From Swiss-Prot:
The keyword Flavoprotein applies. The keyword Oxidoreductase applies. CDD domains: Alkanesulfonate_monoxygenase. Belongs to the SsuD family. One of its GO terms (biological process) is alkanesulfonate catabolic process. It catalyses: an alkanesulfonate + FMNH2 + O2 = an aldehyde + FMN + sulfite + H2O + 2 H(+). This is Alkanesulfonate monooxygenase. The gene is ssuD.
Amino acid sequence: MDILWFIPTHGDGRYLGTNTGGRAADHTYFQQVAQAADRLGYTGVLLPTGRSCEDPWITAAALASVTKNLKFLVAVRPGLMQPSVAARMASTFDRLAEGRLLINVVAGGDPYELAGDGLFISHDERYEATNEFLDIWRSLLKGETVSYSGKHLKTENGRLLFPPAQQPHPPIYFGGSSKAGQETAAKHADVYLTWGEPPHLVKEKIQSVKKKAEKEGRTVRFGIRLHVIVRETEKEAWQAADRLISRLEDETIAAAQNAMKRMDSSGQKRMVQLHQGNRSNLEISPNLWAGIGLVRGGAGTALVGDPETVASRIKEYADIGIESFIFSGYPHLEEAYHFAEKVFPLLPFRTKLQSKASGEVIGNDHFPSRQKEKTV
């Protein structure tokens, strides 16, 4: 089991939809979150991509030098750069960070945003271009000389002179709920990612991608992207969830939902269907809460509960085939501690803690006793 955290390069705070309790999205704060994740033993961190975020490559490069074990799941956007340039960037980062790069291939799901970036192709054409991009990108990182002529991309005698630390290339994470997205994942992904839907829907996706990968003669691992709200008791956790959206105005929700309607991402449409923009009945599956998706694009669901309950829900996903979990929570610094301290001991997750927790010395003479953690 791998557990990753999240660097909030699009902003952070105690409440959604308001600047009250907000955090500065700057290098100092990103470094705090990254170093906390590193010290707590998270496998890595995801950095989001898009016009609402700081650039993930520059941010990850800045954070790699101030962390030790933490891996960085960084987005590549086919169509916005040539595969040869992306291959050189990936190889350089992976060497300088000593094998700590993971690649998140993002085809894009907002035609309005993509047009602003100069990309004017349809949903299915984006996946065609992504397939061609990854054909070239993977071959270059394997050390091959590449000549390629496709519908969208062409390369003549392309070479990568300096190989990455990880062979044949840094692991590829890929998400896509549509038929075209799943077929692309089956051909190229090492880890297929889904947003946090109820387990029975996630299981359907896993089965579908597995079948498609088998036809390609490949095996694919599976991951899930979720938020988390964990507290000592169920009551406290649900109160924290309610507080998170307590300052959301109806106009803010309506504006966010209208923006999501223009998107042609199948995964985003599935997220919206879970709550329909309605504040009521947000617990869409036991302990799976869709409140964040009222205003946040992309991952919009959270596991909510006490440590034992949240660990049990994670195990339910693991039992259907999920191996990689990418979590986040508001605010991201505090929630990284909440989750690691309360839930890690209950999971089959081997952390690389940089220092052992000790607690405060008692009476200037005794170390605190170690309590045996429950397992789920």
